């Protein structure tokens, strides 16, 4: 293929749907034309493959580019079409769409998944957050045990994101939304520049977002007559349900090969946010009490990744962060009208990991991961209340050493093959903290695969964990007029609520046992079943206070009542309970099915070709079907071995290994590499039959036990049977998450559903509060006009655009709480538990693609030295 043909192909990229560019931008350099194949049907034109999703062709026995360390298979793998079918535009939205699959029951709660890029560690989420989904080749979701191989603890799922080898775009996106009940509006805007090529990747992002304030008078909130300060209208207007917030940030990530096979990444970010809320009515002036917040943060991160001559993979990550937060709160005291708090947190860490083989066993090579880490964090906080100032300063330095060992016991193709594949694991970690001394973590596990597509995991962990520096030293914040339900008296009261850090917290000890299974029952059907059972016991767990009779008996100093017994002040800062136990089972399945797409008409293809001056015929090097390709080489035959020196499909020569990320050879007008599986390919060739996707995912988290013992001699709280775990009552027996999506021919729809079963909470007065089951449904409709050839031909400006309509909580469902005695529950009104309700958002996104001149320059930069330009 001549270089002129390649440049003409590049011009075609700019007329066709935007994802098509990613095909050219991510494929290897042009392969010899001997791989071009005529259409199997004999037609001169094959359907346009506008998705640009070339499947990687992996030689049997070879690991796919970007695979993770070890032999634990992914629980689910999404290819580029699966990713696009979610309608997500960046990795942040993609992780939200995958929430049912990436949640874990092994952690203390709220842990984000471990993120890897091309099978390697990163410095943090900021590196990946703004990457457009069009740049993704595939996504792998893996169990918690894989985290050990990268120096993390096994308490969070692992998500490995593999990017295309070449991609370049500038993306602009704006969105605006509002609550259908009124009173609330939100919006955001993003501008992102992203480039990935052989020498590395670059990301620049500017982001702005904000929302308006929502007050109680904009919802049907009822007031307890005993708590009204002014008029009901004044009281409702003086308390916000959602505060106003504005956030602006800018970030940059640069990755390059620094020397040899070592790649380096630098990531930096600056962020500013400010907010305002109303915390009640000033009884003296009858004006709203105001609270404002101001936060500024700066981040600098770096990563070095490399491989030694002995094939040990090593990574060094470092981070430095500075966060400054200020809060100003009005008071109802004319002598001291405002309180002020300020906190400054500075932290830095350096972590090194290395993974490699250490000795041979009959079933394979034993491998290990070694980790060493040093970190420091310093928190300064100050507070001015009623004219009196106080301050505190906390510091923590920590050194960590950890080892993870994997021992293969049997393999199907080696000794003890009757056992299937079995690998044992052992891991240990020692943490030396300046404020908590020496803490240890030990664990063990097994990975067993008796049959193809069936995998079992079991693990045990004993971990000693310190409280965070913020749990210890956050500034104390006093919030007047906080509405709280007092389970002792069965009344809703307004109190002064104290929040902040508790310097007396102790470290906890967590014991976790997990049994997991993953099974794909059918080889040719993308259906995966998964199950995880987790038994967790924690000694001295750290928890926030809830206002119940049992907790008040255990911590009487945290509660202040007046002479009539009414609660007037409560300290909600975290405490250590004696112990807790939780048993959960997560059951789920993931299903994906390719859908046949509509073939563009021959007239549309001809118009595109004529518009850009394509004189040849598609499907090969401009020749007719069945003609001998240029250079006199015979046409390639599907499944036949390549001739001597010819590049095989997947980029491998007959005597050599596959090229990294190899794909099909060059063909058609694709120019930069063939389509799916070689032959044809490009825009006027390749397999176009199954571009659409139908997806469904369902996860049910079943809780069997959720108990807390407050003190060694105290009572026990059973969150499943009558005790309150938070504002939504106890722990539901079932929590169901579901995601479903359809995408084809440039259009798509996605539905998300969340449902929790009912709970009951008992009060000391003999009343029972019933928290009804609640389910919410989210709907996303999106259209990519540039993916429709007829539209892209008539309206070129629509290339790379997406229009999206989103409904959050589409049926406006809210939690409802009822008293068995029929008493009014002022603090459990639906408008308080879910103030915003249903929202509708409209967004527009434009993906700007490079010009033909830019594509030519990139090609010249990436072509091998000495290669002819024509």
What is each stretch, according to the model?
Residues 38, 42-50, 57-108, 122-131, ...:
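N-terminal plug
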Residues 611-684, 704, 752-761, 783-870:
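C-terminal beta-signal and adjacent terminal beta-strands/loops
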Residues 385-482, 498-522, 534:
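Structural signature of Gram-negative outer-membrane beta-barrels, strongest in the C-terminal barrel
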Residues 135-137, 152-159, 165-222, 244-250, ...:
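Outer-membrane beta-barrel translocator/receptor signature
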Residues 122, 131-173, 639, 645, ...:
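A beta-strand signature from Gram-negative outer-membrane beta-barrel systems
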Residues 115, 211-245, 253-399, 412-413, ...:
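Surface-exposed, low-complexity loop segments enriched in small/polar and acidic residues
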Residues 104-143, 171-174, 203-205:
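Periplasmic plug
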Residues 145, 176-180, 187, 197-199, ...:
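Transmembrane beta-strands of outer-membrane beta-barrel pores
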């Amino acid at each position: 293929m001549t270089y002129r043909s390649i440049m003409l192909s590049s011009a075609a990229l700019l007329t066709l749907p935007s994802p098509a560019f990613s095909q050219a931008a991510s494929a290897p350099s042009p392969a010899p034309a001997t791989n071009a194949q005529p259409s199997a049907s004999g037609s001169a034109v094959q359907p346009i493959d506008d998705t640009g999703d070339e499947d990687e062709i992996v030689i049997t026995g070879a690991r796919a580019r970007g695979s993770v360390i070890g032999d634990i298979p992914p629980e689910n793998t999404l290819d580029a079409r699966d990713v696009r079918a979610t309608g997500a535009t960046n990795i942040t939205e993609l992780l939200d769409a995958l929430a049912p699959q990436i949640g874990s029951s092994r952690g203390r709660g709220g842990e984000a998944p471990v993120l890897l890029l091309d099978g390697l560690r990163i410095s943090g989420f900021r590196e990946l957050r703004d990457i457009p989904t069009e740049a993704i080749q595939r996504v792998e979701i893996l169990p918690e045990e894989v985290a050990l191989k990268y120096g993390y603890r096994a308490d969070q799922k692992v998500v490995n994101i593999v990017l295309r080898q070449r991609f370049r775009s500038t993306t602009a996106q704006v969105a605006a939304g509002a609550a259908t009940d009124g009173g609330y509006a939100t919006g955001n805007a993003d501008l992102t520049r992203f480039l990935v090529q052989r020498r590395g990747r670059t990301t620049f992002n500017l982001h702005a977002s904000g929302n308006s304030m929502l007050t109680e008078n904009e919802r049907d909130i009822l007031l307890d007559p005993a708590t009204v300060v002014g008029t009901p209208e004044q009281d409702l207007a003086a308390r916000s349900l959602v505060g106003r917030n504005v956030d602006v940030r800018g970030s940059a990530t640069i990755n390059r090969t620094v020397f040899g096979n070592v790649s380096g990444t630098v990531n930096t970010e600056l962020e500013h946010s400010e907010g305002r809320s109303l915390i009640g009515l000033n009884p003296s002036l009858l004006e709203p009490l105001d609270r404002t917040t101001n936060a500024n943060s700066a981040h600098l991160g770096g990563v070095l990744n490399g491989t030694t001559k002995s094939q040990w993979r090593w990574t060094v990550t470092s981070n430095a962060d500075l966060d400054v937060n200020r809060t100003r709160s009005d008071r109802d005291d004319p002598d001291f009208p405002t309180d002020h708090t300020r906190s400054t947190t500075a932290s830095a860490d350096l972590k090194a990991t290395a993974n490699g083989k250490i000795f041979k066993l009959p079933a394979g090579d034993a491998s290990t991961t070694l980790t060493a880490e040093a970190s420091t964090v310093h928190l300064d906080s100050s507070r001015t209340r009623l004219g009196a100032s106080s301050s505190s300063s906390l510091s923590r330095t920590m050194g960590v050493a950890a080892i993870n060992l994997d021992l293969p016991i049997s393999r199907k193709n080696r000794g003890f093959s009757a056992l299937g594949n079995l690998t044992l694991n052992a891991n240990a970690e020692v943490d030396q903290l300046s404020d908590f001394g020496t803490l240890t973590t030990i664990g063990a596990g097994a990975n067993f695969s008796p049959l193809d597509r069936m995998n079992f995991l079991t693990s045990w962990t004993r971990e000693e964990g310190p409280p965070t520096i913020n749990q210890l030293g956050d500034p104390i914040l006093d919030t007047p007029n906080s509405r709280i339900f007092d389970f002792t008296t069965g009344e809703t009261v307004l109190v002064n609520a104290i929040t902040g850090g508790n310097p007396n917290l102790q470290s906890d000890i967590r014991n976790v046992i997990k049994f997991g299974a993953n099974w794909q029952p059918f080889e040719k059907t993308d259906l995966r079943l998964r199950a995880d059972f987790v038994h967790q016991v924690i000694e001295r767990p750290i928890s926030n206070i809830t206002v119940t009779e049992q907790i008040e008996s255990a911590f009487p100093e945290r509660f202040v009542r007046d002479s009539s017994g009414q609660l007037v002040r409560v300290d909600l800062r975290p405490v250590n309970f004696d112990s807790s136990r939780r048993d959960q089972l997560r059951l789920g399945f993931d299903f994906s099915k390719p859908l046949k797409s509509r073939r563009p008409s021959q007239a549309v293809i001809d118009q595109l070709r004529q518009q850009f001056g394509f004189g040849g015929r598609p499907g090969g090097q401009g020749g007719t079907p069945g003609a001998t390709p240029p250079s006199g080489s015979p046409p390639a035959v599907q499944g036949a071995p390549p001739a001597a020196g010819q590049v095989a499909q997947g980029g491998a020569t007959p005597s050599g290994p596959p090229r990294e990320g190899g794909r099909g050879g060059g063909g058609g007008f694709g120019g930069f590499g063939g389509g799916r599986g070689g032959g044809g390919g490009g825009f006027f060739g390749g397999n176009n039959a199954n571009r659409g996707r139908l997806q469904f995912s369902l996860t049910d988290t079943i809780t069997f036990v959720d108990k807390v013992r407050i003190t060694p001699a105290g009572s026990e709280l059973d969150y499943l049977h009558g005790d309150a775990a938070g504002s939504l009552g106890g722990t539901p027996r079932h929590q169901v998450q579901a995601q479903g999506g359809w995408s084809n021919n440039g259009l798509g729809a996605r539905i998300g559903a969340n449902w929790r079963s009912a709970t009951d909470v008992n009060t000391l007065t003999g009343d029972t509060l019933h928290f009804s089951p609640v389910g919410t449904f989210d709907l996303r409709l999106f259209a990519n006009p540039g993916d429709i050839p007829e539209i892209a031909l008539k309206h070129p400006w629509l290339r790379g655009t997406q229009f999206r309509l989103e409904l959050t909580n589409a049926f406006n469902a809210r939690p409802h709480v009822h008293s068995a005695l029929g008493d009014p529950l002022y603090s459990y009104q639906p408008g308080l538990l879910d103030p915003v309700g249903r929202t509708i958002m409209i967004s527009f996104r434009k993906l700007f693609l490079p010009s033909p001149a830019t594509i030519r320059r990139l090609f010249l930069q990436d072509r091998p030295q000495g290669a002819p330009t024509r």
